[in-house]
A protein has these predicted regions:
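Phosphate-end processing signature that detects enzymes handling 5′-triphosphorylated RNA
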Residues: 1-216
Length: 216
């Protein structure tokens, strides 16, 4: 079980070509390329989402993790969120996906974030759906910032929509100062490949919007 703050920058990329150009321009070392499957949970009326929470079960290379994220605080272009997460067995993940258990069961009930989410959801959560994300992680040296891990994502959303983006997580300590220098460095890197620095919204929100478009 881990608990921490996540401070990250997200910028949209127009297409796969831009993603490849960004990786080349960063001139770093590709650390990994993994496929993630993300399952989102909420109450039927999306009460968690309405109160700023995101509840996710993720499978990556056979490893399963439940993550609860709290409401977002903006730090410039960066998003600052508290989160708590727990690794679980494939068997427990299967029970959650079958509706026989809730992801909230595996989280630390003594953590304030979990208590708030449980009170909000009344423990009645269902699986809303899932989406796939390919993540390429590149370690690079960003001018004016220093060592950084860039996460270059390709996300498959409902309706055949495919989004691309780059993420950079900033250490929570001294987040305001670090986020500002990271934002400048990442904007400069995008400028070098001729891509405008357009902040991206969270994947869960884009997934739900794409899901609603299908239903509508």
């Amino acid at each position: 079980m881990t608990s921490e703050r996540e401070v990250e920058l997200k910028f949209a990329l127009p297409d796969e070509r831009a993603a490849e150009a960004l990786e080349a321009q960063a001139d770093g070392l590709r650390e990994s390329c993994v496929m993630q499957v993300n399952h989102l949970f909420d109450t039927p009326d999306r009460r968690l989402r309405g109160n700023g929470f995101t509840l996710r079960l993720r499978e990556e290379d056979g490893t399963w993790t439940v993550t609860l994220k709290g409401p977002t605080r903006q730090v410039g272009a960066a998003r600052d969120r508290a989160e708590v997460e727990a690794g679980i067995t494939p068997e427990r993940a299967a029970r959650i996906l079958a509706g026989e258990a809730t992801p909230l069961d595996v989280l630390d009930r003594d953590h304030a974030l979990t208590r708030e989410a449980v009170a909000c959801a009344c423990e009645r959560v269902v699986r809303l759906g899932s989406f796939r994300n390919r993540r390429i992680t590149v370690s690079a040296e960003l001018a004016g910032y220093g060592p950084a891990l860039l996460e270059i994502d390709r996300t498959e959303l409902p309706g055949g929509r495919v989004d691309h983006e780059v993420e950079l997580e900033v250490p929570a300590g001294g987040a305001e100062v670090r986020a500002a220098s990271a934002e400048t460095a990442l904007r400069d890197l995008l400028g070098e490949i001729g891509v405008p620095a357009v902040p991206a919204t969270g994947k869960s929100g884009r997934f739900l919007a794409a899901l609603d478009e299908q239903v509508g």
